[in-house]
Amino acid sequence: MIYMLDTNICVYAINKHPDSYYNNLELLAKNNTIAISSIVLAELQYGVSKSKKKEQNQSKLDIFLSRLEIIDFSAKCTFYYGELRTELEQKGLIIGNNDLLIASHAIAENATLVTNNIKEFKRIPNLILENWDK
């Protein structure tokens, strides 16, 4: 199984509970793939770039990333993005562009998206969700 972590879960893990998260990630990684989308990586890198403690935060991010697989957003993902965006617009549902890209990526990879933003993502059909922020 592929678990694809959303940006908010990564930030939570890095800043709030690194030891317990790292232990859980290592256990899960024995039988599963723990990954992030390259879209999530871009959001995390943006967070580092705008922070006041760039070196410290880059180091924390690098340590966190060393435990994960980074999956590039591919041409296959663009199909799901186009379909999802059209469907949601027709229903009058607005979802942030990056969130829609991340959701499309998770669906294309047949991954479970791990997020604490269930309210936003539950509107997306065929997206498997879990919340580890408990």
From Swiss-Prot:
Coiled coil: none annotated. Residues 3-124 form the PINc domain. Toxic component of a type II toxin-antitoxin (TA) system. Has ssRNase activity. Upon expression in E.coli or S.cerevisiae inhibits growth in liquid culture; in S.cerevisiae its expression leads to apoptosis-like characteristics. Rapidly induces apoptosis (within 2 hours) upon microinjection into mouse fibroblasts (L929 line); pretreatment of cells with dexamethasone protects them. Probably contributes to host cell death if bacterial cell lysis occurs during host infection. Gene3D superfamilies: 5'-nuclease. Keywords: Hydrolase, Magnesium, Metal-binding, Nuclease, Toxin-antitoxin system. This is Ribonuclease VapC2. Its cofactor is Mg(2+). Mg(2+) binds at residue 6. The lineage of its organism: Bacteria, Pseudomonadati, Pseudomonadota, Alphaproteobacteria, Rickettsiales. The gene is vapC2.
